Curated annotation (Swiss-Prot):
GO terms for cellular component: peptidoglycan-based cell wall; plasma membrane. This is Biosynthetic peptidoglycan transglycosylase. It holds the Pfam family Transgly. GO terms for molecular function: pentosyltransferase activity; peptidoglycan glycosyltransferase activity. Pathway: Cell wall biogenesis; peptidoglycan biosynthesis. The keyword Glycosyltransferase applies. InterPro entries: Glyco_trans_51 (IPR001264), Lysozyme-like_dom_sf (IPR023346), PBP_transglycosylase (IPR036950), Pep_trsgly (IPR011812). It comes from Yersinia pseudotuberculosis serotype O:3 (strain YPIII). The chain crosses the membrane at residues 18-38. Peptidoglycan polymerase that catalyzes glycan chain elongation from lipid-linked precursors. GO terms for biological process: cell wall organization; peptidoglycan biosynthetic process; regulation of cell shape. It is an enzyme of class 2 (transferase). Its EC number is 2.4.99.28.
Amino acid sequence: MISVRRGLSQLWYWGKRGVIGIIALWMAGILIFAFLPVPFSMVMIERQLGAWLTGDFAYVAHSDWVPMDEISPYMALAVMAAEDQKFPDHWGFDVGAIESALSHNQRNQKRIRGASTLSQQTAKNVFLWDGRSWIRKGLEVGLTAGIELIWTKRRILTVYLNIAEFGNGIFGVEAAARHFFNKPASKLSASEAALLAAVLPNPLRFKVNAPSGYVISRQQWILRQMHQLGGKTFLQENTLD
């Protein structure tokens, strides 16, 4: 009996230290990545491990980091128009979108709608695993609050664009621009940026180089939203250009 208690005590001790260590690493990551390029994300690690487990040792998950000044303003505008139009104003969470998603999901449980902001998506992609669970969502909330507190909006957008997945093994807008359009991210047109943003909900299902009718329709919707937001002026007014 004593040995069992001692074992449980040791398990609790090391488990607690492990949790504290992970939290410390996350905090350090938030501070470091406020200034330095993010070399890899949890999504990249997942994809890399998945490739190795299937015997694909040629697969290399990486992104070609570029600063915001080397990314077309249309790309920043497109992802905000598509994913998070209130990005410049909220503190990491869009309460209205959350309430709308909850209401929709109660009525239609077969087609679940998300309400994650760009800040939440960035926190998840950099620090957390993929999937749906209350534990992961709770951690996402804490990490989102952390990056909103430490990072600028421009920094969050820069990190997001550099680690977002645009296709199988294609991470970051620079790699996507060169792979799909044979040009650097700085030269992307409004139409090209909207097409890249259109596949972001599921880049392994939706294809930039073979867009379905849905993707084309979404691209056109994003272009209209970009115009309604005010185009490049929207970025300038919110110091995101």
